Amino acid sequence: MFQILKAEKTIGFMRWSKVAFVFSIFMIAASIFTLSTKWLNWGLDFTGGTLIEVGFEKPANLEKIRTALDAKGFGDATVQNFGSAREVMVRLRPRDDVSGETLGNQIIGAIKDGTGESVEMRRIEFVGPNVGDELTEAGGLAILVSLICILLYVSMRFEWRLAAGAVMALAHDIIITLGVFSFLQIEVDLTIVAALLTVVGYSLNDTIVVFDRIRENFRKMRKGEPADIMDASITQTLSRTLITSGTTLFVVIALFMQGGAMIHGFATALLLGITVGTYSSIYVASALALKLGIQKEHLMPPQVEKEGAEFDEMP
């Protein structure tokens, strides 16, 4: 198998587990503090508001449109291409004093005045605050249910100490990612929820690969402390981890740089989540299982007595 690193010597990952724990606790505490003070910059999918799609005769200049809307008092508008360079989507937060139709006409007028181009309204939609609340609850419930299912799955496949480490690693990834979004006030919409669920699956996959090697080595390596066996297991899977994470990050970075405003938040969430998830599969999931006292006997298969074995032992 192709390898980036051919480690002839086992890397002592667990030697740095205390430093990693301190770092993780600091990042989680900082994220929770940021979330509690600034919270999240919810998008229209969650807060409600107005969505207006307009068409141009030639490729639209988004910066010119933003400047035109800002001059007319619509500085909170989100402007991005939709479908093609001639189609533009404008998102606005709820405005109680203006109806949806009136707001649409004001937007069209502001764009025409600011750009001097012919503009056609394609569609206008209004997302009520009740729908936004339902989406918020559904998104949070989706993440919670996924964590519970993962806890049950890993408990059945491996052992409860490893399951606790896996779930804590996933919670660690989500909290830190949301903390960065809160600190930077990046808009959170449904694509961000999809990205978080993707991060959960990606991080879990990486963790399961490491755990599978840990279980295999616990059964094969008769000598050595649990920390030594974990170091050997992580070292053996390190090349696979770097190849998988690296190739995925190349694609995500391309999306981040060239994907446009519509998927910028999605790419940012994946970029943060994959980076933090690679770290947590080593220094949160595995290290926490070690702190909880994982031993060889916990992962050894149960011995099954053969029928009639007691008669075979008789002289």
Swiss-Prot record:
Keyword Protein transport in record: yes
Pfam families from the UniProt entry: Sec_GG, SecD_SecF_C
GO CC annotation: plasma membrane
Membrane topology: Multi-pass membrane protein
Family: Belongs to the SecD/SecF family. SecF subfamily.
Function: Expression of V.alginolyticus SecDF in an E.coli secDF mutant restores protein export in a Na(+)-dependent manner, strongly suggesting SecDF functions via cation-coupled protein translocation. Part of the Sec protein translocase complex. Interacts with the SecYEG preprotein conducting channel. SecDF uses the proton motive force (PMF) to complete protein translocation after the ATP-dependent function of SecA.
Subunit structure: Forms a complex with SecD. Part of the essential Sec protein translocation apparatus which comprises SecA, SecYEG and auxiliary proteins SecDF-YajC and YidC.
Name of the protein: Protein translocase subunit SecF
Lineage: Bacteria, Pseudomonadati, Pseudomonadota, Gammaproteobacteria, Vibrionales
